[in-house]
Every structure is written in C-alpha cells, then in structure tokens.
C-alpha cells in the first residue's frame, strides 16, 4: 500500500511539516486497519525516494507471522496478487470513516 502527496516533493524533507504530520497520522491509522483487516503480524513503513522520477511516498508493507523478519522483507519475490474484494471494501470503509473524522 502506498501513501503519496498530490503535490510533487522529492522527499520528506521538501514537504511542509503540516503535510508530513498528516501523512504520519494517516499512516498510523492505515497500519492499524491493515493489521485488523488482513491479519498480518506487523506493518513496516518505509520511504524510498531514489528513482529517476523521484516522488515522495510512503509504503506500508504487511508482514505475516509465517514470513521472515527484518529488512529482507522489503524485497520480495513477485507473486500473483490475489484480490480479496471483501477485505478491500472493509479497509476502504474504515479509511473513509477515518478521513471523515479528520475533516
């Protein structure tokens, strides 16, 4: 899962503090939702802004109990993605509720 700004920033240091604060608060809630809905053990948060078309974003990476721990989880073999509409809709509903609370 990825959280990004609409306005372009190369990395967190270029974004205004107000934007960074909102992103971190949102990421915290989104991590709780991911654990609740998808049943993962942990959610890693990272920002890697180092590509040719750099753009500030935060990645939330679920780690399940059966997966190895540590930074090796940031690079995983690609596998077929199994879309779970019910879980997706539950997460979307909870995120929308959080967004409405913060208005």
Regions from the language model: what does each represent?
Residues 1-103:
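HIT superfamily nucleotide-processing domains
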């Amino acid at each position: 899962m990825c959280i990004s700004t609409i306005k372009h920033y190369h990395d967190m240091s270029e974004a205004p503090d107000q934007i960074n604060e909102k992103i971190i608060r949102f990421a915290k809630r989104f991590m709780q939702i991911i654990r609740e809905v998808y049943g993962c053990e942990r959610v890693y948060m990272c920002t890697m802004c180092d590509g040719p078309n750099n753009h500030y974003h935060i990645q939330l990476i679920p780690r399940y109990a059966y997966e190895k721990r540590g930074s090796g989880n940031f690079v995983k073999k690609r596998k077929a993605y199994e879309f779970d509409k019910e879980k997706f809709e539950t997460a979307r509903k909870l995120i929308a509720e959080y967004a409405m609370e913060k208005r």
